[in-house]
Each structure stands twice: as structure tokens, then as C-alpha cells.
Amino acid sequence: MKHYLALIPNILSSLRLGLALIFPFSPEELWLWIIVVSGATDFLDGWCARRWKVSSWQGGLLDAVADKMFMIAALLTFVMAGKFAIWWIPAVIARDLTVAIAAGYAAIIRSWGSFHDMGARWSGKVATAGQFILLITVVLVPGMIPAALLITVSCSAVAAADYGLLFYQALRRQQADKKAVP
């Protein structure tokens, strides 16, 4: 039975990937529902994986890719619809950019373990929640976008700093471990 349970989180993440693909082509009337379903799958995939003890590195990667793809698809769709400024996007995804840069750096210096061992953080969960709140705000209350953007960017900046510090500490530990081995 556990084998089948292990599939559910990945199916939910895959559903979010599918939603990322259809979002740009969906009528505005469906945007809110697609965002809500995407947010629900984001919550449920991790919750199910932890609850049923079926977490995996590959599932975590699929979840992260699905999150980023959906967020970028939604934000670019809003830009194309004239509802969101393109120059706001880097600020909204600052945490994601930080993690991507850290992963690239880890790969270049062949120190993948320092990146691979970084798990989900509370700051990342708050930043993701802020991003989904921003998407809902764009659809439901466009006049509140500046306030939602400020909150989202603040959460994203805190998460970027948190992940950056964690990566730096992991690199330092790894370097210390290498020096300790004769």
C-alpha cells in the first residue's frame, strides 16, 4: 500500500505542472480557481509526503520545479494581460533565484552535498504562501497589489537570506570536514 501512497505527492506536483502549462491559455474567469487548486496541490503534496513518510529527494525536486513553473507562468500571464509589471518579477522570486544560484555554484565547485542536504525551510514556506497570496490579490483585488507585493517581496528577501546563510554554513562545514580528513 505504501508504494501507491508514494505516488500521490508526485501526482499532485505533476498536476501543478499541468496547471502551469494551461494557465496562460485559460480565460481570466478561471484564473482564481487555477491558482487555488495549484496552491492546494502545493500544500497537499508536501503534507502527504511527510504524513505518509514517503518523502524523496526526487519528489522534492519535482515539487520545487512545479512551484517555480506555476509561479512564472502565472506572473508572465499577468504581465501579458497588463495586470503586473515585469520588473516586479525578480523581486517576487528572489528566494528562488538565490537557491538556483546556490545550486549552480555547488555544481560548479563540485560541492553538491552542501546544496543537496538543504531541506525545506519555514522561510521558504512563508515566501511561497506570500507568492500565492500575491497571485490571488492580482486576480481579486488589483488595487492591493502594492501592499501584497511589499509583503511578498519582504518574505522572499527573508527566505533568500535564510537559504543563503544556510548554504554558506553548509559550505563552511564541508570545507572544514575536508581539512579534517588526513
Predicted features, each with a name:
Residues 2-6, 32-33, 64-182:
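A feature for the membrane-embedded catalytic helix bundles of lipid/isoprenoid biosynthetic enzymes
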Residues 11-60, 74-79, 83, 88-90, ...:
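Membrane-embedded alpha-helical segments that form the functional core of polytopic membrane enzymes
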